[in-house]
Amino acid sequence: MAQAMASMTGLSQGVQLPAGPRRAGGRSRLAVVRADAAAADVQTGRRAVLGLVATGIAGGALAQAALAEAAKPIKLGPPPPPSGGLPGTLNSDQARDTDLPLRERFYLQPLPPAEAAARAKESAQDIINLKPLIEKKQWPFVRDDLRLRASYLRYDLKTVINSKPKDEKKGLKDLTGKLFATIDGLDHAAKIKSPEEAEKYYTLTKSALGDVLAKLG
């Protein structure tokens, strides 16, 4: 009986003895994990610092390059000649009567009769030159160019007619009225995109322009 109790006591002691080393091993592993995590945090922090330093260096280099580029002198050419020195500036140098009420302002520069007649001939030639655009059915360009040139032509013909003697004014006014009737027909043909109507009114407009220009001399 005593031996059995001693055996049980020894067995009980044998089971309890390994508990101490196991706890010590667990604590050591936890310490190793914590040490590894701390080392990883340190490494991550170093990488972040190095990244910020590299970004700062690159930004400084770019800023210096931009400043160096901005410091280069800019070469400026001479101003364009008046009245259409560059594409799209044909109307840029024309006088505006900004001191007058809006309804009385002119958006075209008034010219003497002789110069107005010369500009009217140029506008007429520009209208005649719309033929390729009509053939290509480029209707927006046809309408825009036609309206621009017709506005010049109308204004200059009015200047020329007002300078003529009374007996010549009526004939020019009649021819001008017929001319702008055909121009309106050509504008409408471009609006409805009708090649047949555009060809018809282009021919009539070209003929009417010839009649008017013949009177201008």
Curated annotation (Swiss-Prot):
InterPro entries in UniProt: PsbQ-like_dom_sf, PSII_PsbQ, PSII_PsbQ_pln
Chief site of localization: plastid
GO molecular function terms listed in the Swiss-Prot or TrEMBL record: calcium ion binding; electron transporter, transferring electrons within the cyclic electron transport pathway of photosynthesis activity
Source taxon at top rank: Eukaryota
Keyword Cytoplasm (UniProt): no
GO biological process: photosynthetic electron transport chain
Alphabetical keyword list: Chloroplast, Membrane, Photosynthesis, Photosystem II, Plastid, Thylakoid, Transit peptide
Transit peptide: 1-63
Compartments, as annotated in UniProt: Plastid, Chloroplast thylakoid membrane
Cellular component terms (Gene Ontology): chloroplast thylakoid membrane; extrinsic component of membrane; photosystem II oxygen evolving complex; plastid
Segments of this protein annotated with the region Disordered: 1-25, 73-95
Family annotation (Gene3D superfamilies): Oxygen-evolving enhancer protein 3 (PsbQ), four-helix up-down bundle
Assigned protein family: Belongs to the PsbQ family.
UniProt name for this protein: Oxygen-evolving enhancer protein 3, chloroplastic
Organism (species): Oryza sativa subsp. indica
